[in-house]
Regions:
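Short hydrophobic core segments
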Residues: 7-9, 113, 127-137, 172, ...
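Glycine-rich dinucleotide-binding loop and its adjacent helix/turn
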Residues: 46, 136-191, 195, 223, ...
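Flexible, glycine-rich terminal cap/loop adjacent to redox cofactors
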Residues: 9-14, 23-35, 47, 51-58, ...
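Glycine-rich flavin
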Residues: 2-3, 20-27, 32-165, 198-202, ...
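Glycine-centered short loops/turns at secondary-structure junctions
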Residues: 26, 189-191, 221, 415
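FAD-site-proximal beta/loop scaffold in flavoenzymes
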Residues: 149-165, 245-319
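Hydrophobic/small residue at the entry helix of a nucleotide-binding pocket
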Residues: 14, 38, 177
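Beta1/beta-strand and adjacent pyrophosphate-binding region of the FAD-binding site
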Residues: 1-12, 165-175
Length: 442
């Protein structure tokens, strides 16, 4: 029997980052993966979607240029080549993870893990361990909609395997991945419809932010139905109370459910709703030497959150640089046009916790770089605690928002104040100057 100091089950952004760090700390480490290295994020999530979104940006850039004297050209493309580009991106990053494992002497084991009488078995062989880290992720959740089982629908796990362009795409769901894929497909010519049963799309985002995004999606020609009552799904249409929405391809993007198979085999304690594994502040489960991270434990189901949780768990396992993770310092990003990025408390949440809450907002409409670049849609909003000038949260809507948010977050994470941002010298002309302008307005 081969034994390890640490066995990680799952090679997604939580699992592989944790494994590499443990190995760097001297732990004999193995990673077990039943599917593709890199997990959901790399293979059917973050990376493929950003590849498709980049295609949309290229098309939109050409359309925008045509307004200002550039010759307008009809967009033509071969969708299989776009898919091939996505596959090349994924393959390159898969190779990067394999390289990290090799460089740090992490054993990579392909196979299905299971626990039989408390023993870890993979491919018919027992594997021993001192510590175990579960990073088994999640799978698409498909709600019990009448007729959906009879339809040839796609999920986010299967969408990126399509080699035929969806000329008419209907998406059930209004969360981040649903909106991003709607944005990615529409500029290429797909007729896109979003169907959301909730009162609005992107309910986890700032209200002003989602209004900007929703308006832009509608300007692009994306149809959006909110508070929709789905009565039936047919083979080529979704039947709502007052309208029938036809489709060539149907994507059900209604969230994901944690894969609790191994957690249940181990008898780990779950949360009250039996949806996630219960962990402490160092991501240890109800059993000693067994840890869980990522989609398994709830919270932000984000790749970078899983990575941070993995590092937190490894710090506890190695008893080195032990720390806890501040959930208010995890950035949240939406990759549309404009982009949305945020972190920390919303205004409502801040007012519940603090007495003297202040908020300032400034639009990009007056920013020189934004005007020169035709990127004026959006704003910067910062929320602080007034007495000590502590940064509580921020929202940026605009071009490159997902990059700029870290300017504010870095100051917050280092326990800096809004005054320190106000005293910083920002290069001119940059979109980031709007951050400075907001800071100076307090």
């Amino acid at each position: 029997m081969t034994s390890y100091d640490l066995v990680v089950i799952g090679s997604g952004p939580g699992g592989y980052v944790a494994a590499v760090k443990a190995a760097q700390n001297g732990k004999k480490t193995a990673v077990i993966e039943r599917n593709q290295i890199g997990g959901t994020c790399l293979n059917v999530g973050c990376i493929p979607s950003k590849s498709y979104i980049q295609h949309a940006h290229w098309v939109l850039a050409g359309q925008e240029a045509a307004k200002f004297g550039f010759a307008k050209q009809e967009v033509s493309f071969e969708f299989p080549k776009l898919v091939a580009r996505k596959d090349q991106v994924v393959k390159k990053l898969q190779g990067g993870i394999h390289g990290l494992f090799k460089a740090n002497r992490v054993d990579y084991i392909e196979g299905e893990a299971s626990f039989e009488n408390g023993k870890l078995m993979v491919n018919g062989k027992e594997i021993g361990y001192q510590d175990l880290l579960l990073a088994t992720g999640s799978s698409p959740f498909v709600p019990p909609i009448n007729g959906v089982d009879q339809a040839d629908y796609l999920t986010t796990d299967t969408f990126f395997k399509q080699t035929e362009f969806p000329k008419q795409l209907t998406i059930i769901g209004g969360g981040v991945i649903a909106v991003e894929l709607a944005f990615a497909m529409r500029p290429l010519g797909s007729e896109v419809t979003l169907i959301e049963v909730a009162p609005d799309i992107l309910l986890t985002e700032d209200e002003e932010a989602r209004k900007v995004v929703k308006s832009q999606l509608q300007k692009m020609g994306i149809k959006i139905y909110t508070q929709a009552k789905i009565t039936e799904v047919k083979k080529d249409a979704v039947v709502l109370d007052e309208v029938v929405v036809p489709f060539e391809k149907l994507l059900v993007a209604t969230g994901r459910r944690a894969d609790l198979t191994l957690a249940k085999q181990l008898g780990l304690e779950l949360d009250e709703r039996q949806r996630f594994v219960k962990v402490d502040c160092h991501y240890q489960t109800s059993q000693p030497h067994v840890y869980a991270i990522g989609d398994l434990v709830g919270g932000y189901q984000l790749a970078h959150a899983a990575s941070a949780e993995g590092l937190c768990a490894v710090a506890a396992i190695c008893d080195k640089d032990k720390h806890t993770l501040d959930q208010t310092s995890i950035p949240r990003c939406l990759y549309t046009q404009p982009e949305v990025a945020s972190f920390g408390l919303s205004l409502e949440q801040a007012k519940e916790r603090y007495e003297n809450v202040q908020v300032k907002k400034m639009a990009f409409a007056s920013n020189g770089k934004a005007i020169a670049s035709e990127e004026t849609n959006g704003f910067v909003k910062i929320i602080i605690e007034g007495k000590y000038q502590q940064i509580l949260g921020a929202v940026i809507v605009g071009a490159h928002a997902t990059e700029m948010i870290h300017t504010i977050l870095a100051v917050k994470e280092s326990e800096g104040t809004i005054d320190e941002i106000a005293r910083m010298v920002f290069a001119h002309p940059t979109l980031s100057e709007t951050i400075s302008d907001v800071a100076k307005s307090f």
